[in-house]
Regions:
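Active-site-proximal cap/loop segments of hydrolase catalytic domains
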Residues: 1-201
Length: 201
């Protein structure tokens, strides 16, 4: 199981670390992921809404029924039902019905409480934006509060000014929800400080 078992395992590990190290605040936990990680980060905040305070999910394959079948079969497993029957001329035919074993994230939407930021590339040809839109539709139907951005020129990877925009939105999202720091809404170039820090070493 690529979703439920790892999510429980991650939560347990974070709880153990927070109990062991006083500098870790176990009441303010955030999670981020892209692609399969985007699937997991959205699933995490929907599965454990009282544990995760914030999540950023980008380009997530939230509904594996419309994702790459080869990937899904290898990593999630597919149940196959084989039916045989005869048509009106008496010719025997075999039909195959496949179902994905993992539930789509939109089925978890009812559990979600707060703190989710979704991103998708408008021309993503790896994980179709419909994956994110299906989750969005479920969240709206459940009257849930969340934020979402569509990056117009982006495929599965974010690049250029869109990548910078995405990074800044993610930093600000986590700063607000995990640190109660609204000063992060100001434009701060963290890369500049990281480069300067490297030069001092």
């Amino acid at each position: 199981n690529m979703r439920d078992y790892p999510l429980a395992d991650d939560k347990y590990a974070i709880e153990q670390l927070a109990a062991r190290y006083p500098f870790i605040d176990g009441t303010k936990v955030g999670i981020y992921g892209h692609s399969g990680g985007g699937f997991m980060s959205a699933a995490a905040i929907c599965t454990y809404p009282d544990f995760y305070s914030a999540a950023v999910s980008s380009a997530g394959n939230h509904d594996n029924r419309i994702y790459n079948k080869g990937f899904v079969e290898i990593h999630f497993g597919v149940d196959e039902k084989v039916k045989t029957g005869k048509d009106s001329l008496g010719v025997e035919h075999t039909t195959y019905d496949y179902s994905v074993r993992v539930r789509p994230n939109q089925e978890l939407a009812k559990n979600y409480k707060h703190g989710l930021l979704l991103f998708t590339g408008a021309v993503d040809n790896t994980v179709n934006p419909a994956n994110t839109l299906r989750l969005v539709h479920a969240l709206i139907k459940a009257d849930k509060d969340f934020d979402m951005f569509v990056l117009p020129k982006c495929t599965h990877g974010f690049f250029g000014e869109s990548e910078v925009f995405f990074e800044h939105k993610m930093w600000r999202h986590f700063a607000r929800l995990l640190l109660n720091d609204h000063s992060a809404d100001a434009d701060i170039d963290l890369n500049k400080y990281m480069i300067e820090d490297e030069r001092r070493r």
